[in-house]
Amino acid sequence: MPIPFKPVLAVAAIAQAFPAFAADPAPQSAQTLNEITVTGTHKTQKLGEEKIRRKTLDKLLVNDEHDLVRYDPGISVVEGGRAGSNGFTIRGVDKDRVAINVDGLAQAESRSSEAFQELFGAYGNFNANRNTSEPENFSEVTITKGADSLKSGSGALGGAVNYQTKSASDYVSEDKPYHLGIKGGSVGKNSQKFSSITAAGRLFGLDALLVYTRRFGKETKNRSTEGNVEIKNDGYVYNPTDTGGPSKYLTYVATGVARSQPDPQEWVNKSTLFKLGYNFNDQNRIGWIFEDSRTDRFTNELSNLWTGTTTSAATGDYRHRQDVSYRRRSGVEYKNELEHGPWDSLKLRYDKQRIDMNTWTWDIPKNYDLRGINSEVYHSFRHIRQNTAQWTADFEKQLDFSKAVWAAQYGLGGGRGDNANSDYSYFVKLYDPKILTSNQAKITMLIENRSKYKFAYWNNVFHLGGNDRFRLNAGIRYDKNSSSAKDDPKYTTAIRGQIPHLGSERAHAGFSYGTGFDWRFTKHLHLLAKYSTGFRAPTSDETWLLFPHPDFYLKANPNLKAEKAKNWELGLAGSGKAGNFKLSGFKTKYRDFIELTYMGVSSDNPNKPTYAPLSDGTALVSSPVWQNQNRSSAWVKGLEFNGTWNLDSIGLPQGTHAGVNVSYIKGKAKQTNGQETPINALSPWSAVYNLGYDAPSKRWGINAYATRTAAKKPSDTVHSNDDLNNPWPYAKHSKAYTLFDLSAYLNIGKQVTLRAAAYNITNKQYYTWESLRSIREFGTVNRVDNKTHAGIQRFTSPGRSYNFTIEAKF
């Protein structure tokens, strides 16, 4: 058995020692949003699912998505460069293959297709990441591991992250008509300061909630032990356009790809959540929601390939970026409850959402004396907008029989999306920016498109036998997604010929399933089983991205199929007075992965698949032609264990507890030729150990964490889809590491809470695998020297850092 399994077996053995059989736990309360409302008699543990409630978010000092999953080894955050993160990685897939929803509303898709990254992503001119959300707005986060389109819809191949926003009812009631919360703090890793206000009130049948948060900070620090090293130009490494010979560019120092420090950055985020509701009576309620969030990041991109300096006079440009992520949402909902009727509860909802991902770029000359008053500044603006309008109708009904309970959840919904893009650039006079020295060039790189979708689902939970001994759930969902490229009247006949099925809809439809079984075979032990499926409809850039160029001709492909996943899981869970544990094994199969595929050389024959017309109508001959196509499949399997032990059960002081969370996963991708290759998105084995104490008075507590992560072996990586037989070149920098963290809290009276944490206490230098696999071998951003790897320490994680928060509630 491979060595990485040994810690898993060790914690499994610990599970046998968990005395989880001392007393019956208290009855579980009713489930909430997106859960079937049932009343159980034992603690429910679900395979591949974790709920993180507001109390835990505060305890863990969660300020971003990295903090959210810090102590969950089964999920990681995809690094997206200077503009922030780009979604999550779960069970060997990432980015758009992991669904992200806020109150059931899907968040923006990224521009992360292999084709887009080959053409544009390597140069940093687009903010192509998925948008993030303000953690202070949420009352609960549900993380699902494994295919889950039954609940989360398109994109839930590897899993889903579902956020639920706060409501006034979280804070106010008939006995407490108002609430005011004030929170502030600092985050050491990026010099962040933040403040947040939560206010809620209730008067007669009216209630309201306001959450306003402001954050500002700088670049995320690293743990570099090197200065900005000097490296000699060995040929034309740094400036492919240079005609002056190697002697002109001798040594690159504090700027360029060899830079060891993060690029200077300042950023600010402002977020507003407002809810207003009115209860007509106990059965009928109407509500309104408004969200507005904007993050601006200003970066001096000193590590850009083109900013390399020399020992002679300064040349090249300073490159400045402003990346903007903006999200606005408004919606209305109606709730109804019936004692007798086709539903116990009904929720009707309509939401509109706008997400903008923008990038401004300025190239400013380093030496103004070269051209004096005639110095020019290059400016470009890339704008991606995604608009969504969605309606849903959700119903819940529970039927009680003498020895069984049948709880059903059913509903339907639909929506439409609209994608708009802007892309233009120009030169202006440095000393008088009103004077343009070039035309404003606007070109079409991303074809704008419209989309529609609709779905219907039916999910059931059956509680059978006395004392809720058996629980069976089964559900089915139907989805239909369609998209069409917008027909622009400015398109020439030749351009229209480049876009197949222009204006017509291309649809993807199918069913998703989910079933599970929970057998309580002893008073405190459960046998769990689960089967689920997932799908992901092709994104707009995978379908419609077009690049008609003689050196790299990319054809649009509206005939792509949806990616599919099937997930099997088996587990053993136990709970009792002394603690709880869950051990599970899983296997997931993926198929029809969308990949960039080389089709061959171009032809001037319109009947051949490699026909490659240019915008002027000229057909290319003997140019390389590429297209996104459904190609490979993959499988992953692994083990997960998590458990909590209340150590007062063995005589230690009341409130002492220990915990462990372990994840091990392996897998392979299967190419069209039958070859099995490693999967770069698989995270190495990791385990989190925890020892803590919470005073019985609830006044104070302290927690210590140790995180052990294995190295990502080069043999477990692949260079690229074009080079399947060699490892990722930067995998050799992945080493095993252990981190130690410490957090504590102190309640001062009933109103004030102080929280503090120290991370990476030993100041360990280490690289996360997500950081190493984000390095690019070509382009101008996220680079190191390909030959010497100079600049690799720019990708080290933060060293020792401290977080602090103070919160007052009234």
Curated annotation (Swiss-Prot):
Span of the signal peptide: 1-22
> Membrane topology for this entry?
Multi-pass membrane protein
Gene Ontology, cellular component aspect: cell outer membrane
Major place of localization?
Answer: membrane
Q: Which InterPro entries match?
A: Plug_dom, Plug_dom_sf, TonB-dep_rcpt-like, TonB-dep_rcpt_b-brl, TonB_Hb/transfer/lactofer_rcpt, TonB_rcpt_b-brl_sf, TonB_rcpt_CS
Annotated coiled-coil positions are none
Per the database record, which ranges form the TBDR plug domain? 34-166
Name the residue ranges of motif: TonB C-terminal box. Answer: 793-810
Q: Which UniProt keywords apply?
A: Cell outer membrane, Membrane, Receptor, Signal, TonB box, Transmembrane, Transmembrane beta strand, Transport
Which molecular function GO terms apply here? Answer: siderophore uptake transmembrane transporter activity
* Compartments it resides in: Cell outer membrane
Q: What SUPFAM superfamilies does its record include? A: Porins
Domain spans labelled TBDR beta-barrel: 175-810
Q: What does this protein do?
A: Acts as a receptor for hemoglobin or the hemoglobin/haptoglobin complex and is required for heme uptake.
Which PANTHER family does this chain map to? Answer: HEMOGLOBIN AND HEMOGLOBIN-HAPTOGLOBIN-BINDING PROTEIN 1-RELATED, TONB-DEPENDENT OUTER MEMBRANE RECEPTOR
Q: Which NCBIfam families match?
A: TonB-hemlactrns
Describe the family membership recorded for this protein in Swiss-Prot or TrEMBL. Belongs to the TonB-dependent receptor family.
Protein name per its UniProtKB record: Hemoglobin-haptoglobin utilization protein B
Species assigned in the record: Neisseria meningitidis serogroup C
Lineage, uppermost ranks? Bacteria, Pseudomonadati, Pseudomonadota, Betaproteobacteria, Neisseriales
Identify the coding gene: hpuB
